[in-house]
Amino acid sequence: VADCVVEIWQADAGGIYNSPAEHRGKADPNFIGWGRFPADESGRLSFETIKPGAVPGPKGTMMAPHLTLWIVARGINVGLMTRMYFSDEEAANAKDGILSKARMTGRDKTLIGKREGDTVNFDIYLQGENETVFLDV
């Protein structure tokens, strides 16, 4: 989407969020944990960050390392929320609750960023056969 803005939230490398609600420890003071990025005219954007650690999920489970993304743009009445998981975290991804639910419908691949060297590529599709899984939060 050419005129979209994507906001990204994530834990630090140790799986700790830089948030007043975080009670598991002190987050890396050199890492903010979020950013907001506009897409260019072709709908592409890029940013530099660290790979987050796994974070606790419901009922004592662990969520695989991921970025949470919120997409807003003209024509989208409510921001869309999704996640990007990492292709090199196969064991953690196999245990993640959201990925497990998406796997039941064969749509888990829409949530996996593909590592290529030091870069992870992730395409977000708003509709169609490859539509990204969006979370109802």
Model-derived regions: residue spans:
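Beta-strand-dominated extracellular/periplasmic modules and repeats
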Residues: 1-137
